Design a protein with these regions (language model features):
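FAD-binding beta-loop-beta segment adjacent to the flavin cofactor pocket
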Residues: 37, 137-143
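Accessory recognition modules or surfaces
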Residues: 2, 6, 38-44, 48-50
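Helical element adjacent to the flavin cofactor pocket in flavoenzyme catalytic cores
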Residues: 149-153
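Dinucleotide-binding Rossmann-like beta1-alpha1 core, especially the glycine-rich loop
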Residues: 47-134, 138
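Membrane-embedded alpha-helical core segments of multi-pass
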Residues: 128, 143-144
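Glycine-rich FAD pyrophosphate-binding loop
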Residues: 22-44
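N-terminal Rossmann-like FAD-binding beta1-loop-alpha1 element of flavoenzymes
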Residues: 3-30
């Protein structure tokens, strides 16, 4: 069997990639050891949002953080593609993006999140630091130990 592109993994990323490649005329084959979209993509916790993972920088691994930061425009493009896919297909693909929080329990962590947000915004991500009543209103389930958060809708 011949194919232009073989995609290993039939989850949300593999199937999406196959769709967009096939739409452009590429002969694509998707293989997976399970039925498509039945593992993590079909039964995940539902946290789908774009946000920089900062714990690498908090641990001093700035090189790894820089590599992730360089990929942020791709993550943003991926989010736009989900909406494009729904319009093309004419039905909801059941992908919800309700935003995400990265929390701080100390003043040092909060200052770090403020720097992180500045970098995210510079790269085109809509995010912001929330504290106090605004944070409690947004996420009343958080512990009182949380003094602030980076919220990315």
């Amino acid at each position: 069997m011949d194919t232009d592109v073989l995609i290993v993994g039939g989850g949300i990323v593999g199937c999406s990639l196959a769709y967009f490649l096939a739409r452009e005329g590429t002969d694509v084959l998707v293989i997976d050891r399970f039925d498509l979209n039945t593992q993590a993509s079909g039964t995940n916790a539902g946290s789908l949002h774009v946000q920089m993972m900062s714990f690498f920088a908090m641990e001093g691994d700035w090189e790894r953080y820089a590599r992730l930061e360089a990929k942020l425009p791709l993550y943003l493009a991926g989010g736009r593609m989900w909406r494009e896919l729904e319009r093309e297909l004419g039905f909801e693909v059941e992908v919800k993006s309700g935003g995400g929080l990265m929390v701080a329990e100390t003043d040092d962590q909060l200052r770090f999140l403020e720097k992180k947000v500045a970098g995210e915004r510079r790269l085109g991500l809509t995010s912001g630091v929330v504290t106090g009543a605004e944070l409690k209103n947004l996420a009343p389930y958080l512990s009182d130990a949380v003094i602030g958060a980076d919220f990315c809708p």
